[in-house]
Design a protein with these regions (language model features):
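Long, histidine/aromatic-enriched segments associated with O2/redox biology
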Residues: 12-31, 39-425
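N-terminal secretory signal peptides
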Residues: 1-8
Length: 425
């Protein structure tokens, strides 16, 4: 029995009650740049779904979901045709799963009885829960470390897909850095996100191998004005000044690659930077509130700048404090990261909290899995991170242990596949 869609149950509705109708409205703004009517918002949060095909890949301006499974793959020693075949298979499976369907042609409990199921089945009763699946290509997909043109696409590597520099203070683990291909699966149910990566990994067997992956929870940014600003594991509101889907002019300027931006195949796409940032939780928890707020440059409760106002009041970096020094310290995070002090540089943040248990000393292995999308990393992330790495007061409480960059192509047309213009135009 063919099955394009799982049987959807309301069993998970109560656990997903936090997915508000407002998130559905934000989804319409992100995808179509105009808010849908109320009838477009599903009564059951588990039924929330976003189109897979379109001008842009979903999972960028889509309202940030609550859960993440991020996976990075290295492509095996295969011919170009096999890489294209993998991308085609991934596209078909991702499109099905994003609509609440099976990864394969048959549902997990259907198909040939003496063959392995085409879908692992753990998401059968959960619904799509807002699942988005976003694909990206790393620098090493274009050119190997020894300079080899692996798949005949070295001359099509975009100028903006630079090798990220090693920033001051970086303590990078190469095992969780870099990579040929990335998949970002976001959903409001963690099992749905894990199911997506699990099945795409299974489909890749013999063609690409999992290099590393990361689970995330509690989004640390809002990509829609319908969403409240979340908090990171330091307890502060995070991403107050983030780009929002409801400002399409700013998104066009800072996120989407234009036709004239170098490689035409990247039009409608973006560049993704990932950074795994471990927080020194225990020292932070023993730090005075006054020092915490000084390091951030905002109040812990309401997220207002120390210069006054509410969360969304523009910081006054010239306002004097005690002793005549600026009330927002010169090394405060908000000052160093703010667009006003970075020549207007902006990016769309889409990060998540993570907790990977404890280390051997009993310290919490936790922090921020930072994700950001931008039109050109050399004009946004790289200069901003260079400033932060140099003097941010938060550096005492953080360690950057993973780093990667990916070219995220524009969305696929139905019947085509993600990245088709790279290989076929």
């Amino acid at each position: 029995m063919a099955a394009d869609t799982f049987r959807i149950s309301r069993r998970r509705a109560l656990s997903l009650a936090g997915v508000s109708a407002a998130a559905g409205v934000g989804a319409g703004v992100a995808a179509g740049r105009s808010a849908p009517d109320a009838s477009a918002v599903p009564a059951d949060p588990a039924a929330l779904k976003y189109p897979f095909y379109g001008e842009h890949q979903a999972g960028i301006t889509t309202p940030a979901q609550d859960r993440l499974h991020f996976a990075v793959f290295d492509v095996d020693d295969i011919p170009r045709e096999e890489l294209i075949s993998l991308l085609q298979d991934w596209t078909i499976a991702a499109a099905r799963m994003s609509q609440g369907g099976s990864a394969g042609e048959f549902a997990p409990d259907a198909g040939p009885y003496e063959a392995p199921p085409e879908d692992t089945g753990e998401a059968m009763d959960l619904g799509p829960t807002g699942l988005t699946i976003t694909f990206g290509f790393g620098p090493t997909l274009f050119t190997a470390a020894d300079g080899t043109d692996r798949f005949g696409i070295a001359d099509r590597r975009p100028r903006a897909l630079v090798d990220l520099p090693r920033f001051s203070g970086d303590m990078l683990d190469e095992r969780i850095s870099g990579g040929d291909l990335c998949i970002q699966a976001c959903a409001d149910d963690p099992q749905v996100a894990v199911h997506a990566i699990r099945n795409l990994s299974r489909i890749a067997f013999g063609r690409a191998s999992l290099r590393y992956s990361q689970l995330g929870f509690g989004r640390t940014s809002s990509t829609s004005t319908a969403q409240v600003t979340p908090r990171n594991l330091f307890g502060f509101k995070d991403g107050t000044a983030n780009l929002k889907a409801e400002d399409p002019a700013a998104v066009d300027e800072h996120v989407w690659v234009a036709d004239s931006d170098d490689q035409a195949w990247m039009a409608g796409g973006s560049y993704l930077v990932s950074r795994k940032i471990r927080m020194n939780i225990e020292p932070w928890d023993r730090t005075r509130l006054s020092e915490q707020e000084r390091a951030i440059g905002r109040t812990k409760g309401h997220g207002a700048p120390l210069s006054g106002g509410d969360e969304f009041t523009a910081p006054d970096f010239s306002m004097p404090g005690s002793g005549g020094k600026p009330i927002i310290a010169e090394q405060a995070h908000v000052r160093l990261a703010h667009p006003d002090t970075n020549g207007g540089a902006r990016m769309l943040r889409r990060g998540y909290n993570f907790v990977d248990g404890n280390d051997d000393l009993g310290r919490l292995n936790a922090g921020l899995f930072f994700l950001c999308f931008q039109r050109d990393p050399e004009r946004s992330f790289i200069p901003v991170q260079t400033r932060l790495a140099g003097s941010d007061l938060l550096n005492e409480y953080t360690r950057h242990v993973g780093s990667a960059i990916f070219a995220v192509p524009g969305g696929a047309a139905e019947g085509s596949y993600v990245g088709a213009r790279l290989f076929e135009s």
